[in-house]
């Protein structure tokens, strides 16, 4: 599919040759040496032969453009990005009319690396200071294993409770009461109910998708109003998913809560995190459990699922949402994809011709004044789109947000960098910042990042554990990590 995607959009990219076909045909036809050679070769229709040669050259130029873009994108974002681009193309097809994709001259594929040039100039998300609550950090490190546990273990099939236990790891006092890991997808994700007597909690763990491309495709969906909550919008598919999980686990939850008197802890990763957030909302204000137990939610890599954040139904909920570095899923919503598409279309409309390819080929390093001007045109075009979005939202795509208190895990390289530290992995140093969901309302294409690695549950665990070790080493002082 990604090959088809590149071919479709890159076919238009060869327009940078202008009227190459016509020009080459004319050159062949007007060259006496070619005419003489054609006669010797027995070519009767010289114009047809010249035209065929022009088409061949044009085709090869198009293939070279495709390979250039693929090489550039792979170097910038890692090989996994092709699956991500495939998913993004599917997402943009959902809103092709609004984006006017048919009017694209070069295609979105050609624009993405250039849009990424501007994204690389942006500052990191605005934060509200470091996470200094050591007890809460301890809990996040602990509960991320339960989010991972919802995936189970591939080598233990047919024994869901045992699979969850092994995936969670050795944790005393944990008893899995119910588990259904065989269901997958956004309709009814895998899930389990457990009692943790050590932490004194009943746990509802919800599984996410196993691939980044699936997570992106499923995360980008329509919004719908939540019943009994006028004005509160939620991701339509994940809201249905949350209702299905509650229906399948209500009995086990009620029984475990009644037996123990413990509060309820809901957790998940990726789409499982989005579903966990919506389960928290539904069980709080729409269809509460008996006795209305105290509830908390730990969401790792959640997509935007609710809005507006000022709605009364969201007040009083205890939701902790974690975003790892440049993970795209917490930034993936229909509104955000639409605005990324607008940025691509703005770049596509620029009359840059061969400058766009030279900039891609040379890592956006202009070699002359013309290329410098071309780069600035690109930066200005994308910035203008971002400024327009800041003024108002598109009425067809209401914004959804990651709910609760947001924590951003930054892997420290240079100050404020989202790039990998170019040292041994054991020396990578994470920090965790408190932030607001509004700071993640853009689907960014950051160079030097790995979309898949940033999204994996293991990456979240590594970041949280690394920051915990740092706080312990410095006696709770967050300090600036150099």
PLM ranges: what are they?
Residues 9-267, 271-482:
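Non-catalytic, mobile gating and regulatory segments of ester bond hydrolases
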Residues 1-7:
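Low-complexity, disordered terminal segments
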């Amino acid at each position: 599919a990604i090959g088809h995607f590149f071919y479709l959009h890159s076919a238009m990219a060869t327009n940078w040759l202008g009227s190459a076909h016509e020009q080459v045909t004319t050159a062949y036809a007007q060259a006496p040496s070619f005419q003489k050679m054609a006669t010797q070769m027995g070519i009767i229709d010289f114009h047809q032969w010249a035209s065929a040669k022009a088409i061949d050259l044009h085709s090869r130029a198009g293939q070279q453009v495709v390979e250039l873009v693929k090489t550039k994108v792979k170097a910038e974002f890692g090989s996994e990005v092709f699956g991500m681009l495939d998913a993004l193309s599917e997402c943009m097809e959902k809103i092709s009319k609004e984006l006017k994709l048919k009017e694209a001259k070069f295609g979105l594929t050609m624009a993405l690396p250039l849009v990424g040039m501007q994204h690389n100039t942006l500052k990191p998300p605005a934060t509200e200071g470091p996470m200094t609550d050591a007890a809460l950090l301890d809990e996040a490190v602990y509960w991320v294993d339960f989010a991972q546990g919802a995936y189970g273990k591939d080598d233990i099939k047919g024994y869901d409770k045992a699979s969850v236990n092994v995936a969670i790891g050795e944790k005393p006092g944990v008893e899995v009461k119910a588990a259904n890991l065989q269901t997958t997808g956004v309709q009814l994700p895998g899930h389990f109910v457990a009692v943790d007597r050590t932490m004194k909690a009943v746990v509802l763990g919800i599984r996410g998708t196993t691939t980044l491309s699936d997570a992106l495709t499923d995360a980008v969906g329509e919004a719908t109003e939540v019943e009994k909550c006028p004005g509160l919008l939620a991701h339509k598919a994940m809201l249905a998913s949350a209702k299905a999980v509650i229906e399948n686990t209500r009995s086990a939850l009620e029984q475990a809560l009644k037996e123990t008197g413990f509060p309820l802890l809901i957790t998940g990763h990726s789409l499982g995190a989005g579903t966990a957030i919506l389960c928290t909302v539904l069980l709080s204000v729409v269809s509460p459990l008996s006795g209305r137990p105290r509830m908390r939610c730990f969401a790792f890599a959640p997509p935007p699922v609710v809005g507006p954040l000022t709605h009364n139904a969201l007040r009083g909920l205890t939701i902790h949402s974690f975003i790892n570095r440049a993970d795209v899923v917490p930034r993936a919503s229909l509104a955000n994809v639409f605005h990324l598409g607008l940025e691509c279309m703005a770049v596509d409309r620029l009359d840059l011709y061969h400058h766009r390819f030279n900039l891609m080929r040379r890592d956006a390093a202009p070699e002359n004044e013309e290329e410098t001007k071309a780069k600035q045109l690109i930066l200005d075009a994308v910035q203008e789109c971002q400024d327009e979005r800041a003024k108002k939202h598109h009425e067809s795509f209401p914004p959804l947000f990651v709910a609760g208190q947001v924590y951003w895990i930054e892997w420290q390289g240079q100050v404020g960098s989202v790039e990998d530290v170019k040292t041994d992995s054991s020396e990578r140093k994470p920090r965790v910042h408190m932030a607001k969901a509004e700071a993640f309302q853009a689907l960014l294409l950051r160079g030097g990042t790995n979309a898949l690695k940033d999204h994996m549950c293991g990456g979240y665990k590594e970041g949280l554990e690394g920051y915990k070790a740092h706080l312990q080493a410095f006696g709770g002082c967050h300090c600036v990590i150099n």
